[in-house]
Amino acid sequence: SKQPTYPIDSKVVTTVDQTVHPVPVSSTSPKLLPTEISKYSQYGYGLWQAGEGMALQKRLDIMAPGFSGAEARHEAKLLRFFTISDIHVSDKETPAQAILYGAKGGVSSAYSGVMLYTTHVLDAAVQTINAIHRKNPIDFGLSLGDTCNSTQYNELRWYIDVLDGKVIDPSSGAHVGTRTVDYQKTYQAAGLDKDIPWYQVLGNHDHFWLGFMPPDDYIRQALVGENIVNLGNLFVDPRGLESRGFYMGSIDGSTTYGDVIGAGPEKAFVIPPKVLAADPDRRSLSKKEWIGEFFKTSSG
């Protein structure tokens, strides 16, 4: 059957036309934890408004001293290209992540509500690129790395498949909520316009676990298992991935707002917490394997 799509607004603008500004949260609103997504709208969190556009900057600093362009008599377009970076397509249901570090604020890269919709955000960005391309053709695109959040095969395939315009199943493991939870539902990605070639760079999150630790055997095995990883404070503990003491948490994909599960001190759990199901597609990729997947694409 035909899968749903998520078309963007027909009016597509750039920062030359307008900018985006957050609406200040009322002083009477309570402070919310990042995980309290269900209360964001009620208390005025996450709202934004349009602001004035920004003029394009002339990079005269790369020209000869004293150059102003005043003597120029002819204009010509050299290249027109797009860049995307730090997309962090995330398997929010994986047992090997670090949600605990960000669930109460402080480390937004460890937890953010946007984790539920990373493939959808990328799909919207691709549609925006296509719309701009139709107005004024783009020569090529550059993706500058941190495509994935944590070296996982399924994260990389989601990324490539969104660019290729494939059907996207944004869930993993038990694939719960695929009929009832918005962020879990299968959908048809728009795909990047086939006339735009694109080039890829490897980022730290693409070959390090969470961007800063080479995955060891414990992490590699945890990724394809059910047990939520048990780690210490990786920021200060010299034992690194060999440290223990805290379960790092995961997301329950059967819940409307992506409830955090299995996060907290080891002593708070009678039984070690688990995700709903293991998934071999969560496996960690080596650099060679990661690069190899880009030869399995129908775009670019």
Give residue spans per PLM region.
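Acidic, histidine-bearing metal-coordination/catalytic regions of metal-dependent phosphoesterases
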Residues: 1-140, 153-201, 206-299
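Acidic-and-aromatic substrate-binding clefts and catalytic sites of carbohydrate-active enzymes
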Residues: 148-151
